[in-house]
C-alpha cells in the first residue's frame, strides 16, 4: 500500500462524487451478473456509472477496469478508493487540496472546497494530516485495518483482529516498545509489534499483509505450514505461547517464594476444609490454557489536561490517539452521563492479573492498600499442582500440536487435558526435573499478566472425606455446549459433565451468499419468537460456564485413588476460579469427533455484551474485587466441520462501535448483529468504574503541576497496567531494577524506554493507594551486578575452554583405557549455560536417566540411553565442579594378556596332565 501522502496521478479522471450517490449505488446490484452487495465497487471515471461485484463473486469491477481502462474505483461498503494503475489505495481529500490550488476543470465551479468531503464522514476512512485529533477520533477511528488473506489464512486474520482489539495487550506493544526485545528466533514479538503499529497508526493502509507473522508462526509450529485451513483457537494458543516465550522475564526470588508458600498452604487439606465448602462450590476441571499474560492498551485514562496525562504515557503517536479518546470517555463518565455498552467495554477493563506485580512488590515492606491485594498474585504458580513443570505456563496441549501437522481441517483435535469437563486427575507430586536440583525459575510476561488466571481443583474421597487440592493456570476456558437434557439437569442442580471433543473445520470455504445469510437470519428470528417448548431452551454462556464448573463424580472406571485409604474409592471432583484474568478468553467447543465422522454443534449460544458476572464460579480464597466482564471481540466460524470461514466482530476502543473484520474488509455493524452471531471464541475484559475514577484523580494531580524537590521514576510497564488494568496491583519497579536496587548493566543503555518520571504528588498518591515500589529517585548502574556478570563470563569461558581442551585430547587418543558416559539431558543444560543461553548453571550431574542396576548391584548403561561419551579426565573435571553421578564406565581397563611362550607352556603341561 502506498502512503496516504503520495498523490495518485490518476485523480484527474474522477468525476464529481457525492455521498448520496454512493449510498444509492450501494443498494443496487452488479450491472454484469446482478449480484447484490456487500462489497460492490463503483467506477469513479467521469460519466461512468458502472457498478460491479468484487473478488467475493465474479470480480466484474476488475474486468471493467481492465477493459475500459478506468483506473479508479470505490468500495461501496467501506468507501475506500483503489487505483488499478498504481495498485494502491488513494485518498480523495488530497485531490481536493491540490486542485483547489490550481484551477481544476471539474471543480472550477466551486470557489472553495466544501466544508467536508462527502467521503469524510465514513468512519473507516483514514484521517487527513490537517484534521484535529478529536475529529480524527470521532470520524476516522484507528484500528480499522483489514488483513489480506494469504490462502486459507482467515483463521489467523480473525485471531489477530480479536487480539488487536484487546486494549491491555495492544497498548503494551504501542507504548512499551522498549520492552519488546528478544534474541530468540523467529522474533515473533517483533513481527507482532510491527503489525499492531501498522494497524493502529494514524496513516494506516486499508489493509495490511501479515506475511512476517505468518512466516514466523510456521517456523514455530509446522502444523500451520501450507495452505490448509486451521483452527483459530489453536493458532491463538500457539501465538501467545511463543510471545510469552520471547518476552518472559524471571520473577524476583521473593515473589516465587510467596507463590510456593501460598500453594503449599492450599495443598492436601482434610475434612475441615470440606466442611466449609460444598463439592459444587469448589469444583474445577482442567481448563484449556495457552500462554501467559500481557499488558495493555492505553485506555482508560482519567479526564483532565492532555499535557498532564502525557507525563504518564509514552509520547507514541498511536498511543496518544487511544489515550485521548479514553480521556473523553472518562470525562463523560465523571459527568454522570449514561454510556453505551461499547464505551463501558473500552474503559472498564482492567485486570487482576496485575497480581504478578503484587507478588513482586510484596518483598518490599510497603503500606497495605485495598488494591494491592489483587487476586492474581499467581504470576505463574510454582505450585504442587505441577500442572506446569516448565517455566512457561502453557498447557500440555501445545505439545499435542505436532501430532496434527498433517491435518487439513480447521480445528485440530485438542488434547483431553485441555477439555473442560473431561479432565485427567493430577497427583500433587513434584515433577521430575531430570536431576536438576537447582530451584526452577518462575517467569512472567505481558501475555501472562493479561491472560493468565488460575483455578482451584479439589478432589474429595467419599469414604474418608479427605480433600486434595491442586492449582492450575489457564489462559482460556474451553466450555462445552450443553444439550437440552443437559440443560434440564443443570437447572435441576444434578448436572453431570459429559466429555466432548473439539474438532476440525475445513480446508476451504465457498461464500454462502445472500440466500444462505437470509435463511439463517430468518431461522434465528423465528426461533427467538417461538416458545421454548417448541425449539427447546436457549443456551446461554452462563449455562456453558455452569456445565464446565459442575461437580464430577469419580466412580466406576474413573474411581479416585485415595492416598489415605490406599485404594480406589468413589469421589467427587469440583473446582472454582482462584484468580480472574484481566482478559478472559472463552472457547466454545463446537467441533466434535466420533470414530467414523465429525460434526459441528451449531446451537446458538447467547452471550452478554456487558456485565458477565463470574462471582458464582469463584473460590472462597479468591480476593478479586472486580468480577464482571464486558465483551471485546468475538470470533465466528461459518460452515461445517469439513469446511468453513472465520470472521471477527470487534468493538473499536475509540468510538465504541462494533465492526466486522472479514479478512481485508472492515464493515460497521449494529450490536444486535453481534449478539446473533454463532460465537466460537469470545474475549471479555474486566470492567471497573473505580479504576476509571482512580485514573481521573491521577490525571488531575498531574495537571496541577505542583512544584516538588524530588522526581520519582516508575516502571513504564506498571504505569501501562495502571492505565489499562482494573486491578494493576502494587507498583512494580523491578522490571528495570536488579535485586540490589540499581539498573542491570544490560538494561542501562535503554533505560529511558523502561521508566517514566512522575511528580512527587502523583507518586505519593499512587504509593499510598497501591503500595509496592521501591521508590527510585536516582538511576545508576549496579556495580555488584557488573562484577557478577564479569565473574560469570569468566567462569563460562574457563569451563568451555577446559572442556574443549580435554575433549580434543580424548579424540586424539586411539585406545582410551576407560570411557565415561554422561547424560545428554544434563550436558545440554550445561552447554546452554556456558554458551550464555541460560543464566543459571545446571545442578549436579544426574546420570539416573541412563543408568540401570544389575542384580549384583553393578551400575551399567541403560540400553538405548541418551548419553554422550567423555574421557576420564573430562568426567573428573565436571564432577569436581558440579558433583553428582553415578559414574558409568562403558570400557574399563583391560588386564595385560600373557605372552605366547608362557601360554604355550601352560597348554603343554595341561595336555600331559590329562594323559596321566
Curated annotation (Swiss-Prot):
Amino acids binding Zn(2+) 1: 8, 10, 83, 86
UniProt xrefs under Gene3D superfamilies: Cysteine proteinases, DUSP-like, Zinc/RING finger domain, C3HC4 (zinc finger)
Q: Which GO terms describe its cellular component?
A: centrosome; endoplasmic reticulum; perinuclear region of cytoplasm
Gene Ontology biological process terms, A to Z: antiviral innate immune response; endocytosis; negative regulation of canonical NF-kappaB signal transduction; positive regulation of autophagy; protein deubiquitination; protein K48-linked deubiquitination; protein K63-linked deubiquitination; proteolysis
Q: Where is the active site?
A: 154, 645
> Which residues participate in Zn(2+) 2 binding?
30, 33, 53, 60
Listed Basic and acidic residues bias regions: 260-280, 317-333
Q: What does this protein do?
A: Deubiquitinating enzyme that plays a role in many cellular processes including autophagy, cellular antiviral response or membrane protein biogenesis. Attenuates TLR4-mediated NF-kappa-B signaling by cooperating with beta-arrestin-2/ARRB2 and inhibiting TRAF6 autoubiquitination. Promotes cellular antiviral responses by deconjugating 'Lys-33' and 'Lys-48'-linked ubiquitination of STING1 leading to its stabilization. Plays an essential role in autophagy induction by regulating the ULK1 stability through deubiquitination of ULK1.
What name does this protein carry?
A: Ubiquitin carboxyl-terminal hydrolase 20
This chain's source organism reads Mus musculus (Mouse)
